[in-house]
Design a protein with these regions (language model features):
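Amphipathic alpha-helical transducer elements in NTP-driven molecular machines
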Residues: 11-18, 35-38, 42, 78-89, ...
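Basic, low-complexity terminal or inter-domain segments flanking catalytic cores
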Residues: 2-5, 81, 92, 120, ...
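Short, polar/flexible loop-turn hinges at active-site or ligand-entry regions and domain interfaces
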Residues: 73-76, 104, 124-128, 149-156, ...
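Intrinsically disordered, low-complexity regulatory segments
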Residues: 1-164, 470-471
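C-terminal or mid-to-C-terminal helical accessory/interaction module adjacent to the motor/catalytic core
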Residues: 94, 137-221, 256-257
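Conserved short loop/turn motifs at secondary-structure junctions
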Residues: 2-3, 101-106, 183-185, 256-265, ...
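Metal- or metallocofactor-binding catalytic centers and their adjacent structured scaffolds
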Residues: 234-267, 273
């Protein structure tokens, strides 16, 4: 009997698939049933080979060996995952397996994970695609009933492959180029570099910020306070205050308007990561990791989404969810539920996956017993669903203008008429008292009653107040995610899809890479560029730092998913960029190339090429990158006599090829002795010899 093989991304997901496919027989690395087999990857089972695996000459980083442009891309099994790969490869080639099912995450990265394993295993069997947005049993069962051919996802797969190859080409070539030209490891990344540039640019603005004073004049009659526009000159402000103090002012205009604020949208991944950081201080990575676990536990829908809407066919199920939210949220009662379901429905703005929602299973199981951090996330998602479908916030805005000494002074008041969705927002904020408060854009204030147009205000008091411009704030996880999401948007026309730096699924890992590489650092909730990060940005050309160019690449990948451009077009541009990087690096002046090298003590001249020899942690090495000469501090020759090479010895060896060494130890005679250490060269390699100086005759 023929079977089909399902490949999941993780073991926990595979178990959910197996349960719904009645594949209960547990084997080493897979589960099997009568009609199917379910196995799993462990994230990326396969990856692109390193340059030295294409050609051994790339083991040594040489600028003249660049560019590295593979004609045929080589794949290899990821470290420590060979056993599981062999399991999948064997299953793929089993004679009773008729076709495969790609059950990896329904998105670009899931396509890449499956495609690499499929190619590396040399499989040619037909593939179907499982595409689901929830791990609930009903969603899984429906997904298997409505599978499409993998051929229908070929453009998505192509975009995934091109993204990975572009990152490899720019990373490998850019990093090797700048490292060899500056004699210091400098890591270049397609998305990482412009993100670091944003951090460095913001920090530079902060460090060079000079505050400037500006002034206002406030008038009051004891009840109402009105304020002038900003005044740049202090003397002018003082003069206006003096003129108005004790004068009679006139109310020239009172304008009342009924206004409304609309509820927020549902969460996509980035907006959820931002709010989780604001409310709870969670990093983007921590939020994504917990969301993935909640997804696999069947409590939330697919997390790596870029949509904040749901589709028309979900209307009834979403309404049912909203009605059940008071069961999960103690601070929400049924009277606060609105009827704004239409606002969250937009078929045109849902591509692969809809907005993040709690599942029916979450309602049935409850969230009370979850760990605190996961419970926080679940509450955040649930209350957002209530807010997004809630009633509008209505308020009355009053603007009053008072004229005094021919100058206008103004005040604004806001009085709530209907709290609507803000009632839930306020209750949730009170629940999260330990979290960093979310800044209110406008505070609720009221204009005192009893004022009418034409009314005179006698003997008003006038006072000059001093204010200062504020420096830009350092990025935190919330604001950096926002900047990445909108990077380059102003440069695109209205018809262009705006994708920013990275994707919702990759932004967290980009931030983590910057921190782990030492180019950025966390200071409390702030994310700051390190000294090394700022130095790296200084040597990078504008086109590598450009958020606009990188955002345009993301847009092109999206167009590729839609079949509007080809992989050849995209990769042609990436290859051209690689060549441009090398052209620029080749022209870096010699003096500029030494910018990272500190003034170092010259130990001597290299006996092979004549260049300076410097001291390293483990050796004394030639400064010429093309020369391999080095004297090792711990070497076998001296080590056998319990001695290491020190700076004085190295200096004398380089100067006159001889140094006198005291305290050498002979194991054979179990005694210490003194001798001359001689340096010679054999095929350019250092060789040591001992010579015992003749004792002088008395």
């Amino acid at each position: 009997m023929s079977k089909f093989l399902v490949i999941a991304e993780k073991p926990s997901v595979a178990q959910s698939y197996a349960k719904n496919l009645s594949a209960y027989k547990r084997e080493d690395g897979y589960l099997e049933g009568e009609s199917c087999i379910v196995s799993w990857c462990l994230g990326h089972l396969a990856e692109y080979a390193q340059p030295e695996e294409y050609d051994p000459k790339y083991e040594k980083w040489q600028f003249d060996d660049l560019p590295i442009l593979p004609e045929v891309w080589k794949l290899k099994v990821s470290k420590d995952k060979k056993k599981q790969f062999e399991v999948i490869k064997t299953l793929m080639n089993r004679s009773d397996v008729e076709y495969l099912v790609n059950g990896c995450d329904a998105g670009r990265e899931g396509e890449l994970i499956f495609q690499r394993v499929y190619v590396l295993a040399g499989c040619r069997k037909p593939v179907k695609r499982l595409w689901i947005s929830s791990m609930e049993d009903a969603a899984i069962q429906k997904g298997f009933q409505t599978m499409k051919s993998e051929e229908e996802y070929k453009n998505l797969c192509m975009a995934a492959v091109c993204r990975a190859q572009a990152d490899w080409l720019i990373g490998m070539n850019g990093t090797r180029a700048y490292t060899t030209r500056y004699f210091k490891r400098l890591v270049v990344g397609r998305v990482q570099t412009p993100t670091l540039a944003m951090l460095a640019e913001r920090q530079e603005r902060i460090e060079h910020f000079q505050k400037e004073a500006f002034y206002k004049v406030a008038l009051t009659d004891g009840k109402l306070t009105v304020v002038s526009e900003n005044i740049a000159n202090e003397e002018a402000a003082e003069l206006l205050a003096a003129l108005c103090n004790g004068s009679t002012a006139v109310v020239t205009q009172i304008k009342k308007e009924r206004k409304k604020s609309f509820p927020p949208k549902l969460y996509d991944l980035t907006s959820l990561q931002r709010e989780a950081n604001r409310y709870f201080g969670y990093t983007a990575k921590r939020t994504l990791d917990m969301l993935q676990e909640l997804y696999e536990e069947k409590l939330v829908t697919y997390p790596r989404t870029d949509s904040q809407f749901v589709t028309e066919d979900m209307k009834d199920s979403v309404e049912e969810l909203v009605e059940k939210m008071p069961v999960l949220l103690s601070f929400v009662d049924y009277g606060q539920l609105g009827h704004g379901i239409k606002r969250v429905i937009n078929n045109a703005k849902v591509s692969d996956h809809h907005a993040i929602l709690p599942t029916k299973e979450a309602v049935e199981k409850g969230i009370a017993d979850l760990p605190a951090d996961k419970k926080n996330l679940m509450m955040l998602i649930c209350q957002q669903l209530v807010q997004a479908t809630g009633e509008e916030y209505l308020y009355e805005q009053t603007d009053i203008t008072v004229k005094c000494q021919e100058h206008d002074f103004k005040a604004r008041g806001k009085i709530p008429v209907q709290m609507g969705f803000k009632e839930v927002e306020k209750a949730f904020k009170q629940l999260c008292v330990k979290a960093e408060p979310v800044e209110e854009k406008e505070k609720e204030t009221s204009i005192p009653a009893g004022y009418e147009e034409g009314m005179r205000l006698f003997s008003v008091k006038a006072e000059k107040t001093t204010h200062y411009t504020s420096p830009p704030k350092p990025f935190n996880e919330d604001t950096l995610l926002a900047a990445m999401e909108t990077a380059g948007n102003k440069e695109f026309d209205s018809e262009t899809e705006k994708k920013g730096l990275g994707t919702p699924a990759t932004r967290a890992s980009i931030i983590e890479k910057l921190v782990s590489s030492g180019y950025a650092q966390r200071k409390g909730k702030q994310i700051l560029p390190s000294t090394e990060g700022k130095e790296l940005v200084k040597v990078m050309p504008e086109y590598l730092k450009s958020a606009v160019m990188t955002a345009e690449w993301e847009n092109q990948l999206l167009l590729m998913e839609k079949g509007e451009i080809t992989d050849t077009q995209f990769m042609g541009e990436i290859t051209s960029l690689v060549r441009k990087i090398l052209e620029v690096c080749r022209e870096i002046p010699e003096e500029e190339r030494r910018r990272f090298q500190m003034e170092r003590e010259v130990i001597g001249k290299c006996p092979v090429c004549g260049c300076d020899v410097f001291e390293g942690k483990q050796n004394f090495y030639c400064s010429n990158r093309q020369c391999d000469f080095a004297l090792w501090k711990e070497n076998r020759f001296l080590g056998s006599m319990e001695k290491n090479l020190d700076k004085k010895m190295a200096r004398e060896l380089l100067d006159k090829a001889c140094t006198h060494v005291k305290g050498l130890y002979s194991k054979k005679k179990d005694m210490k002795f003194d001798a001359d250490l001689l340096l010679t060269l054999e095929d350019g390699k250092p060789r040591f010899h001992l010579e015992f100086p003749k004792k002088k005759k008395k």
